[in-house]
Amino acid sequence: LEAFVFEPLADAIERDDFCSLAPIGWLHHKMQDSFFLVVGTHSCQGFLQTALGVMIFAKPRFATAVLDEDDLSGRDALEGLLPIVEAIVAEHKPGAIFLASTCTPEILKMNITGCAPPLEEKFGVRVYPCRLDGFDPSYTQGEDHVLEAMIARAPETSEKNLVILGCLSALEEAEVRLECETMDLPVPRFLPNESALDLPPIGPNTVLAAVHPYLFGSVAYAARERGCAIHKTIFPYGPDGSRAFYEGLAAAFGKTVSYEAREREAWGACEREVEAIRGRSVAFISDAMLELPIARTLRAAGATVPLVGTPNIYKKFHALELARLEGVDVIERPDRFAMYARLSEHKPDLVVANLNIANALEGMGFSVKWSTELSFQPIHGFNGAPSLFGLFAASLRRHDALAKIRGKTQTEAAPIDLDFFRFDGAPLSLRAPHALREAPQPSSPLPDPTGATSAALAPSPSHEVRH
């Protein structure tokens, strides 16, 4: 699909992001009749048990089929999954099972997708195969793969209808229904909803509106396979985004409406939170793929956004958001050391960062907000705007309180000078981004049992050293 061709503008190949199994947290709560069976390792099992915070005796609706040595030798995956799925069906009686392939099965080229049809036929339960591995740029794209698997099973239709794509809370869904009713639009269907079996019909006359900026895969799949029309506006984050979203929905059905008064009312309801944000600077170096729309609405609230680092940019899908970030340094797949230097230059009041580097940034003197907080909060639409701005207002108030305690009036970032040590004890200083300074050699080489000296074993200054 030409409209969704990816044009890389990468800062670095490496990336720092959360696990792609994280969307199970909100998806299994949304779809009450679902069960997520993850085919992976003990690391996957540990993540699900700790990150999602559910005790075993609570009978959670997710589990891990742990790979063992037999699986590594090429054993048929279906053979090992049969007794596990049988136990799940007997105990939980799910309406649908999501069979999730993780990093290890993908590397081993295990045919997890091919196991879905025979499992569905044998146990009479719908099985959605999906990929929840760490090869995607962002952990939130796990939801994208789940929705793509569901769209493939959705019934076809020739009628004009509206489908809202993306997991929303009950409050957020209620707002969309109310606004569509007010505009006299078709009753919207949601994917996902409370049942994993209740799939909205999708066809060439369907208007598909994605509410998350990371759903480009499922949107492209629906457009390619079903020929549906894609709702192209900015995403419904903040009063400005919500206004554009609803006015765009009306235009898709041939209606002209104005949400100017509704937007003004929403800004008034957020005034206390916006007051704490106005005039402050916020930078992003995170992994949620929510950075573009949230940076846009923070600018509309009066904040300064000097820097936005995001895991992935699809120029066509994100074009309208990028157009509203003119003058902002937007970096795709940012290199952490280069970003440290940029942050040191801009000295923002708040940095939205992923968990991997949050503590490091705190140690450098920055005030940090975890990017994962944005994924688990109801921040869409007019009603979600106070929650969205409240997240940033609370962090900035904390920043001000700590600054008073420390006797500082603004962020005083520590200089970027991280000392690493070679095996022979000679220090190497790494100055961002990727500037390697040669360290002095020790005056007397360390003895080596083989007769060689540590100086001879030390890497040449011309070699690239990566940390």
Describe the predicted segments one by one.
Residues L1-H467:
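An N-terminal assembly and electron-transfer interface module characteristic of large anaerobic redox
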